[in-house]
């Protein structure tokens, strides 16, 4: 095993072979977590340098394949806690429990290597520490791999009679199929919620791209884990600042970890279209936007905590800022969040508004929204189907904004406090546009839109206000269209209609 070295000069051949043999069935390793952890440490200590990495990547693909197999082997969802997504206590303890032949001197030495790197000696190695080291080992191998063209490198190496570097093909990163492997890998984030874990998934995305993207964006936990891991890192930095001796973390290592998370954000921004990013963010919009706000406020403090700022660190800070903004501004835009700089970080709001203006003029969008409101001549309380025609009269407008009509006081009250499109959130902005511009008299004028835009610009009306108005009107129609479709579905299904009527009578 030419050139491969180990910590404490253990037999490198046996370290690799026993590690791989133990994971022949990664669902049931032959050894405990301490033994597996010790093997990894014996081959990957920092003092062993990059030479070991290169030798392992060229000569011992089976070593990396075993590491990947342990992280990606499908496990029953019942093995995991539904709240934390960590392994269930009994599963975790069974995994960590030592069944090794401790009479074997080599096994004793491997256990000693593991103990030497952990604060508490002589106890089982936690699954979280084994997971962390697995992610480190794989990430170190994928860092150069993500910048290489794996297919071209394999062809060139074969033609030159050289050994191919691991991974030789993207499929080696999802040995149990893309869906099953990625779902299993993501569950490890509940066991090892670390920046290196997200960084590794980012590297996999850089290499495998669309082959695994659907299962990354389709995860029901990954968006929240992204926000959680960012917050864990910030809290660790705060602890380091207050009690430096309490943690191994330094401002420099914190910056490196934040860069790893930013790389994952970078891959999402580069690879996801609007539909995919909306699927990813899904139920985590608030968490992701809060994450962005937190990081953008934290970065100047993190920068100050670095003793001397190198050119590389300056670049890293800008990279982190760029891709947290890029991800969060897209989430803000795609989910039609208000352009409110008191609620969201100003940089997120401004970049989101910039994306909107690339699609069209927010002022003209607002005018078109006003025109659509006027055309429909109906009550704008979601859930109400009354129109001017059905009621035989025009409806009174909201007295505050003098724009939105309602058929009755109860409808207006309900609309004011609606859970998704509350009129109270936009009324003041609507009123300011009506008061300062030629509305509503110019709505039917073919040149009314241009007159409206010119007036807004002349009076210095903020485009963000117009954008908020346009988006709110869009949301109103979306809400009302959803309700209309539901009612039409009920009317087309007699059984459901009867059930609905029966429920109404009971009430």
Over which residues does each language-model region extend?
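Flanking scaffold residues of small Cys/His-coordinated metal-binding clusters
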Residues: 374-379, 393, 402, 422
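Generic structural signal for coil/turn-prone sequence and helix-edge features
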Residues: 1-386, 433-507
């Amino acid at each position: 095993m030419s050139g491969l070295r180990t910590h404490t000069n253990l037999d490198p051949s046996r370290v690799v072979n026993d590690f791989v043999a133990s994971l022949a069935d990664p669902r049931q390793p032959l050894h405990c977590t301490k033994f597996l952890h010790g093997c990894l440490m014996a081959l990957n200590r920092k003092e062993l340098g990059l030479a070991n990495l290169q030798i392992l990547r060229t000569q011992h693909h089976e070593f990396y394949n075993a590491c990947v197999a342990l992280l990606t082997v499908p496990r029953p969802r019942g093995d995991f806690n539904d709240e934390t997504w960590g392994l269930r206590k009994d599963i975790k303890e069974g995994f960590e429990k030592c069944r090794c032949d401790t009479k074997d001197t080599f096994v004793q030495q491997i256990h000693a290597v593991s103990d030497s790197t952990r604060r508490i000696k002589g106890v089982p190695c936690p699954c979280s520490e084994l997971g962390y080291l697995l992610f480190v080992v794989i990430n170190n191998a994928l860092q150069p791999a993500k910048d290489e063209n794996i297919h071209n490198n394999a062809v060139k190496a074969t033609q030159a009679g050289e050994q191919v570097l691991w991974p030789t093909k993207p499929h080696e990163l999802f040995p149990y199929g893309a869906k099953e492997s990625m779902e299993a890998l993501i569950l490890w984030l509940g066991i090892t919620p670390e920046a290196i874990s997200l960084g590794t998934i980012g590297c996999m995305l850089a290499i495998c791209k669309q082959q695994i993207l659907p299962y990354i964006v389709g995860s029901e936990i990954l968006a929240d884990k992204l926000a959680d891991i960012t917050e864990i890192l910030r809290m660790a930095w705060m602890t380091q600042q207050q009690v430096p001796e309490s943690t191994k973390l330094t401002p420099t290592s914190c910056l490196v970890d934040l860069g790893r998370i930013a790389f994952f954000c970078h891959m999402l921004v580069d690879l996801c279209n609007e539909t995919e990013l909306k699927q990813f963010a899904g139920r985590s919009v608030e968490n992701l936007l809060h994450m962005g706000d937190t990081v953008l406020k934290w970065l100047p403090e993190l920068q100050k905590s670095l003793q001397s700022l190198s050119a590389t660190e300056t670049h890293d800070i800008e990279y982190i800022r760029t891709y947290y903004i890029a991800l969060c501004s897209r989430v803000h835009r795609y989910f039609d969040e208000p352009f409110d700089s008191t609620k969201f970080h100003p940089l997120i709001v401004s970049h989101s508004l910039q994306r909107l203006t690339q699609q069209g003029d927010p002022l003209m969008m607002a005018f078109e929204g006003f025109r659509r409101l006027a055309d429909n001549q109906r009550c704008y309380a979601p859930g109400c189907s009354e129109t001017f025609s059905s009621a035989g009269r025009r409806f009174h407008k909201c007295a505050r904004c003098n724009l939105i009509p309602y058929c009755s006081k109860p409808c207006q009250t309900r609309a004011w406090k609606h859970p998704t499109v509350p009129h109270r959130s936009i009324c003041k902005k609507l009123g300011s546009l009506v008061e300062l511009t030629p509305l509503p008299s110019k709505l039917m004028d073919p040149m009314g839109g241009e007159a409206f835009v010119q007036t807004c610009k002349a009076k210095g009306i903020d485009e963000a206000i117009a954008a908020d108005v346009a988006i709110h009107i869009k949301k109103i129609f979306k809400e009302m269209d959803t309700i209309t479709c539901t009612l039409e579905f009920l009317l087309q299904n007699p059984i459901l209609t009867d059930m609905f009527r029966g429920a109404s009578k009971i009430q």
